[in-house]
């Protein structure tokens, strides 16, 4: 066999070669974790799964953009997700903010991708997603053809790194003139029922296939992850998302790019890629199970303290501590986050210490820090 530079240079390159002996144990583990997570959600009643879904979708939207170097406003994303899910009535209106048009469009795209998992994927739908990513027709300062395939007018589509004079080409996508046929083949395969191919494996192959085609000027990574989410929703048998694959990809981004590049420069065996994909999916599910338990613990905390008096600042900060609070809680940080004085912040904190909600951290350093007490989360 004559070795080619990229996987798509081989004839019949999408006749994917996989080693089931390596993959089936990983598939079994992922399926077990999926079952645990969905079973856990079914046991939580009505509101807690909604909160878990809100958290997971918010995380997915933020992280799929962060992978591309774009930082979205979390509160705007969360508010947009709540409105699209129709659960904004469960939250204090003062905590919901108005999202930008761009954020609203991205949220809608991600939700539609999973919500319609039982419907065939179409090229028109992918075009609509692309337009949602770039509603102004610009990517940063550059005008792009939103909702249209790339035409390679300015040269071949390449994935590169490094600055001027030291550019490294990691990958070159198929030529633009091949895209209509290649995408038609991909979409036909994506929609075809294949009883012998587990849907978690199909999600991994779809991810590799679409990102290898790189059919647009920009946004290919986010579209790839939306397409992956759709197949994962089908594998779950549920449009409700409770875990974030993008968050786990971001956490191992260097490994992701490394295995992707080696696969795209290899032969047609994609076993190593699928091993990485399934392991990463398993990690995403495990993290979701941990977050879900945190959600349960938070609900139990508020139930135990249903007759305890807290002021609005304390309620806000306790919820932050149960959620995505980063770093150590200090009087200074409390004052800054609640927009109050240091004296008021200290009174708020001391009151929570007296009520057994907070304890002083053992290793506080130069300034005293606090954390939830052990019996607050048990």
Q: What are the residue ranges of the model-derived segments?
A:
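FIC/Doc superfamily catalytic core
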Residues: 1-378
